[in-house]
């Protein structure tokens, strides 16, 4: 049986006057009240040892729905008090959660369900997408600057936002799930992402450069840029393109280090000679674990 999604629901049931509830529901509510202390025990001092039958169920579901933790999550924390169990943690698969709840119920467990399915729509206030907002952002295993780096994101790259906890937990276009510092992306709604994707872009073609506040390299810089960065094309002025960032900032980038995306795509060559020439152009760029940008490149 599935009882409460969180403690607050249980607390609400306890403090609500009985006069509010129809008499025919009082007996069932009384039964629920009797179970609340059991879940409280499971929450605070519950046994974290997972019974073999539950471990087997969890392992089978993880293999089915999240075999590669880099691209799918099934991180469940269990707290037991006899046949009562509280579930905490996160998963990216609603199917996996349903299968877990069904499996536990069939084995006779009463479940307090606090397992969260990502993306966290409510916590993100509808902004379940994002756009990389800096030249290169580092994506990490955990929400900490000392955590191992998984990969990198380039300015203009769309991502799926799964969770916010100081940092953002995101999923990249190639399905990697990682944490990024909040300044690295600009959260948007689905509609805002569609507008960004449909806008004409300017692509940075040089390994490194800058966007300026005015169409002059003597003006204040807005930010740096790196090869492969995408900016919204707002117009042209002399030797510069006027561009906009995902967060709305504007500036000017030299035509000598960038070009319209459509033109860039038309000139791409994917033959062996062109790929080797591009690789040679990056000789001397520093090695960086999980680096995928012109600021630092991994060996792979």
Regions found by a protein language model. Give the residues of each.
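SH3/SH3-like beta-barrel superfamily modules
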Residues: 86, 97, 150-182, 221-255
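Beta-loop motif signature
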Residues: 132-158, 204-233, 287
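Boundary regions of SH3-family modules and the immediately adjacent low-complexity/disordered segments
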Residues: 102-122, 172-203, 216, 221, ...
């Amino acid at each position: 049986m599935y009882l409460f999604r969180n403690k607050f629901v249980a607390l609400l049931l306890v403090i609500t006057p009985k006069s509010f509830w129809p008499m025919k529901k009082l007996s069932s509510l009384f039964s629920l009240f009797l179970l609340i202390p059991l879940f409280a025990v499971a929450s605070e001092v519950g046994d974290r040892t997972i019974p073999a039958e539950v471990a087997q169920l969890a392992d089978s579901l993880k293999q089915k729905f999240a075999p590669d933790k880099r691209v799918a999550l099934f991180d469940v924390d269990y707290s037991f008090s006899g046949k009562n169990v509280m579930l905490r943690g996160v998963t990216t698969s609603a199917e996996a959660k349903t299968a877990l709840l069904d499996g536990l119920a069939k084995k006779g467990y009463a479940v307090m369900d606090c397992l969260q399915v990502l993306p966290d729509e409510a916590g993100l206030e509808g902004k379940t997408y994002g756009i990389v907002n800096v030249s290169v952002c580092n994506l990490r295993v955990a929400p900490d600057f000392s955590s191992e780096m998984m990969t990198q994101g380039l300015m203009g790259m769309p991502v799926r936002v799964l969770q916010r906890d100081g940092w953002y937990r995101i999923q990249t276009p190639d399905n990697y799930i990682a944490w990024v510092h909040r300044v690295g992306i600009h959260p948007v709604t689905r509609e805002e992402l569609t507008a960004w994707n449909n806008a004409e872009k300017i692509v940075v073609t040089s390994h490194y450069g800058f966007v300026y506040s005015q169409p002059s390299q003597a003006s204040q810089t807005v930010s740096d840029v790196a090869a492969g960065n995408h900016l919204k094309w707002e117009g042209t002025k002399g030797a510069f393109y006027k561009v906009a960032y995902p967060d709305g900032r504007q500036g000017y980038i030299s035509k000598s280090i960038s070009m319209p995306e459509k033109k860039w795509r038309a000139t791409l060559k994917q033959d062996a000679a062109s790929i080797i020439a591009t690789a040679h152009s990056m000789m001397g760029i520093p090695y960086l674990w999980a680096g995928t940008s012109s600021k630092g490149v991994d060996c792979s």
